[in-house]
Structure formats: structure tokens, C-alpha cells
């Protein structure tokens, strides 16, 4: 019996082949299959955000002005979260809440779920775009893997956290000052800065900034012109065709500075990838924990001693008092629908007061 080996060839192109040829064609802006997800979602997310910050009020959901039309500026305008009474409703335009009424849909906070969901899928589409292009030009997919960090943070903060709470109301609104308010909320209600996952996130982001600055400066310092040795000052020519730098010189320099240095470029650049991505993933995990109201460090012994001894106070106990103040002063303003009233005598005061 004879077995013929070979590639199967089609006589004519089907619809998939035709679409594949058009989507993956070499053009100024690559589209690709990922573009079918990325471009519509990014368009709707950005369009919804610009529409909301320009025209839509938050009076019906938060009792706030939040649009340029009402007098806000770029820092104070926002697309606000839906009302707390709407819980985790997707707030579809044709759903039972808005019933196809676009004005009412905007008043209820429908633009927030619209922007959040399209934004999440737009980010996923951008990561798939990096996968697709990397595969097309036969690169490793580390760019896409790195971009999973920002996606994890976005999904955990804007989607998973409010899903663990009573509704979308407790997610961040899409605006600069609104994000600042959310950060204060996280600190007051979750003591977020003392959370080890937040600490790892800060170490990752600031460590990555330090590594980036050191790496950029070192490469600039050790650039040399081909054929003229590694004299970094005399030989540097910004018009040379190809930028090159001396790893040997850089290694010698940092060995003298710190006593240790990266010995090869692969380990160096992997470390620069690992630090920020791991930090972002750890902070995302921490936010998932907060969604479930998990607590981090509680130094109860210090709190008890501070309550018993007016002269004993630590930075931790001071921060706990500050958090109580945030909760007491913020809750009434942040959740007006609850009609919270705190008498003066229950508002926290430090030992010095």
C-alpha cells in the first residue's frame, strides 16, 4: 500500500480565506482578526466616555454634577457608576430599567456599564492584537503577556470588586477626581495601603520605573559607533545607522557601583518584564480579596493598648483613626441614598484632640 504525504490544497478560496486575506493584509494600520474585537469595543468605550463626560449628569445616581455641560472641567468630569439600587444589572438600553429610553438610560448610569464592558473587551482585543502580530512576524508573545498586567488591574478594580460588593455603585467612576475619591474610599474602608498585595504592586510599579530609568541611562551612556571601540563620549554619533551599546562596559560600571550586575541581556530584560507585571498581578489579586472583604494586617494589640493608654500611639493606630474618620465623614456624602447621620460625639478623634 502506498501512502502519499503532502499538504492539502483547496481549489478555490472560501469565505474564511477571503476574510483572512483582507484582515491580515499589510497596511498602514493592521486590522487582523483581533481588530474585529478591538476597534468596535475601543470606539464605543471612548465614545461613551466622551459622551458621558460632556453631557450626562450624575444627579440621579450620586447627587453630583459630573459633565462639562454642568460646569465640570477635565479633572472633575466623570462617567459615574449606576445607582446603588440597581445592584449588578447590566443596564442594557433595551432592559427593564431604561426600556429603550436613551435619556433615562443615561440618567440611570447605563453609560458606565457600557464603557466598563466595552473597555474590558477592548483591552482584551488589544492583547490579542499583540498575540496575532507576534505570531505573524514570528516573535515571542511576551508583549501580550506583559499587557495582561494592566488588564488584570482593570478587570479586578472595575468589574470584580463591585461584583463582590452590593452593586456597580461601589466601582470607580470614569474620571480623574472620581478615581481619587475611590482611592480614599479604598483606604478608609479596606485599609488598602497596609495590604501586602498593595505593597507588592507599589514595589513592582516603582521598581519598574527605577529599572527603566537605570536601563535607559546605561544604554545611552554606553552607546558607541561601530568600529571605533567603546569610548562612550568621543565615539557617540547620533546619526549612525544602527544603535549599538557595550554590554561589557555597562557590566563593568554597575559591578563597580553595586558589586553586582546583570551578566547578559536576556536576564536583564526578563527582569524588567517580570517586576512590573508581577506587581500589577499581585495588586489585582489584592483587589479581588477586597471584593470579598478580606482583611490584611490588623494589629489589634496596638489598638487595645492605644485605647487603654492615652499616651501610647503608633503610626498604625493613627492611621486606624484616620480610616474611621474617612468612613464617618465619607459615607454620608458618598451614599446619600442611605440618609446616614453621624452625631458629633461618634466622629473619631485622635489622642491629641
From Swiss-Prot:
CDD domains in alphabetical order: Photosystem-II_D2
Alphabetical list of PROSITE patterns matching this protein: REACTION_CENTER
Modified-residue entries (N-acetylthreonine), positions: 2
Keyword Plastid: yes
Phosphothreonine modified-residue sites: 2
Entry membrane topology: Multi-pass membrane protein
Subcellular location: Plastid, Chloroplast thylakoid membrane
Keyword rRNA-binding found: no
Enzyme Commission code: 1.10.3.9
Binding positions for chlorophyll a PD2 per the UniProt entry: 198
Cofactor note: The D1/D2 heterodimer binds P680, chlorophylls that are the primary electron donor of PSII, and subsequent electron acceptors. It shares a non-heme iron and each subunit binds pheophytin, quinone, additional chlorophylls, carotenoids and lipids. There is also a Cl(-1) ion associated with D1 and D2, which is required for oxygen evolution. The PSII complex binds additional chlorophylls, carotenoids and specific lipids.
Enzyme class (EC, first level): oxidoreductase
Residues that hold Fe cation according to the record: 215, 269
Gene Ontology CC terms, in alphabetical order: chloroplast thylakoid membrane; photosystem II
Record keywords: Acetylation, Chlorophyll, Chloroplast, Chromophore, Electron transport, Iron, Magnesium, Membrane, Metal-binding, Oxidoreductase, Phosphoprotein, Photosynthesis, Photosystem II, Plastid, Thylakoid, Transmembrane, Transmembrane helix, Transport
PANTHER family referenced in this protein's UniProt entry, alphabetically: PHOTOSYSTEM II D2 PROTEIN (PTHR33149:SF12), PHOTOSYSTEM II PROTEIN D1 (PTHR33149)
Misc. comment: 2 of the reaction center chlorophylls (ChlD1 and ChlD2) are entirely coordinated by water.
Record function comment: Photosystem II (PSII) is a light-driven water:plastoquinone oxidoreductase that uses light energy to abstract electrons from H(2)O, generating O(2) and a proton gradient subsequently used for ATP formation. It consists of a core antenna complex that captures photons, and an electron transfer chain that converts photonic excitation into a charge separation. The D1/D2 (PsbA/PsbD) reaction center heterodimer binds P680, the primary electron donor of PSII as well as several subsequent electron acceptors. D2 is needed for assembly of a stable PSII complex.
HAMAP family: PSII_PsbD_D2
Family in the record: Belongs to the reaction center PufL/M/PsbA/D family.
Protein name according to UniProt: Photosystem II D2 protein
Amino acid at each position: 500500500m502506498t501512502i502519499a504525504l503532502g499538504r492539502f490544497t483547496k481549489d478555490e478560496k472560501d469565505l474564511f480565506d477571503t476574510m483572512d486575506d483582507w484582515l491580515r493584509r499589510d497596511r498602514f494600520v493592521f486590522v487582523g482578526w483581533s481588530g474585529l474585537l478591538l476597534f468596535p469595543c475601543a470606539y464605543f468605550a471612548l465614545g461613551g466616555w466622551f459622551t458621558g463626560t460632556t453631557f450626562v449628569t450624575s444627579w440621579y445616581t450620586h447627587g453630583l454634577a459630573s459633565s462639562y455641560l454642568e460646569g465640570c472641567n477635565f479633572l472633575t468630569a466623570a462617567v459615574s457608576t449606576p445607582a446603588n439600587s440597581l445592584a449588578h444589572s447590566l443596564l442594557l438600553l433595551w432592559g427593564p430599567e431604561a426600556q429603550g429610553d436613551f435619556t433615562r438610560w443615561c440618567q440611570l448610569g447605563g453609560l458606565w456599564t457600557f464603557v466598563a464592558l466595552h473597555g474590558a473587551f477592548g483591552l482584551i482585543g488589544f492583547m490579542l492584537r499583540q498575540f496575532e502580530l507576534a505570531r505573524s512576524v514570528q516573535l515571542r508573545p511576551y508583549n501580550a503577556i506583559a499587557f495582561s498586567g494592566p488588564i488584570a488591574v482593570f478587570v479586578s478594580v472595575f468589574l470584580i470588586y463591585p461584583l463582590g460588593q452590593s452593586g456597580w455603585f461601589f466601582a470607580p467612576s470614569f474620571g480623574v477626581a472620581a478615581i481619587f475619591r475611590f482611592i480614599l474610599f479604598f483606604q478608609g474602608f479596606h485599609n488598602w495601603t497596609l495590604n501586602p498585595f498593595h505593597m507588592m504592586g507599589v514595589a513592582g510599579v516603582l521598581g519598574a520605573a527605577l529599572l527603566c530609568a537605570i536601563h535607559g541611562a546605561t544604554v545611552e551612556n554606553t552607546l558607541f559607533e561601530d568600529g571605533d571601540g567603546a569610548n562612550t563620549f568621543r565615539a557617540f554619533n547620533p546619526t549612525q545607522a544602527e544603535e549599538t551599546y557595550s554590554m561589557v562596559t555597562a557590566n563593568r560600571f554597575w559591578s563597580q557601583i553595586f558589586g553586582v550586575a546583570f551578566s547578559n541581556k536576556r536576564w536583564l530584560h526578563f527582569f524588567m518584564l517580570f517586576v512590573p507585571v508581577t506587581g500589577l498581578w499581585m495588586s489585582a489579586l489584592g483587589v479581588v480579596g477586597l471584593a470579598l472583604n478580606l482583611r490584611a494586617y490588623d494589629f489589634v494589640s496596638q489598638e487595645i493598648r492605644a485605647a487603654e493608654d492615652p499616651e501610647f500611639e503608633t503610626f498604625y493606630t493613627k492611621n486606624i483613626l484616620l480610616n474611621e474618620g474617612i468612613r464617618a465623614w465619607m459615607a454620608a456624602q458618598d451614599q446619600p441614598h442611605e440618609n446616614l447621620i453621624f452625631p458629633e460625639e461618634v466622629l473619631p478623634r485622635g489622642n491629641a484632640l
